[in-house]
């Protein structure tokens, strides 16, 4: 978690307890005297105070804009989807967002838009960021 934290599923499902719990956790972590962090994912790191500060800044941005949190979650979840599936036809991703509850519900509840429109925006932003690539009409995770 050197550069942030994971998806806040509670908020995505309409339970507003996740962000306050994350804040309490980060504030408690900030009080600890830590020399090295050995995370469950990623390399060990020593700049603990900076990592907690980054996580708190990200949390503040999400508290100020639940839509930003939801968009970040959609990007992360779709990236993980592609890591599992390897590739998806771009033409079918809008339908996929409409069929998968988390994508469908977040599209409608946070953005008041149809899932296909949100899918198009998520794909475009991830392509622009270099996280995804387009190959022969398919969307793939970079490096796959």
Task: Please provide the spans of the model-predicted regions.
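C-terminal regulatory/interaction regions
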Residues: 68-144
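Metallo-beta-lactamase
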Residues: 1-50, 54-63
């Amino acid at each position: 978690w050197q550069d942030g934290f994971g998806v806040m599923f509670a908020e995505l499902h309409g339970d507003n307890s996740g962000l306050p719990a994350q804040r309490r956790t980060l504030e408690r972590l900030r009080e600890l005297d830590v020399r090295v962090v050995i995370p469950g994912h990623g390399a060990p790191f020593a700049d603990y105070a900076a990592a907690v500060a980054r996580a708190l800044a990200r949390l503040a941005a999400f508290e100020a804009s639940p839509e930003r949190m939801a968009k970040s979650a959609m990007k992360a979840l779709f990236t993980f989807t592609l890591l599992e599936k390897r590739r998806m036809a771009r033409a079918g991703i809008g339908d996929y967002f409409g069929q998968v509850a988390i994508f469908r519900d977040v599209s409608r509840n946070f953005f008041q838009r149809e899932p296909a429109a949100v899918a198009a925006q998520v794909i475009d932003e991830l392509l622009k960021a270099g996280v995804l690539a387009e190959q022969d009409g398919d969307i793939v995770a970079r490096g796959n």
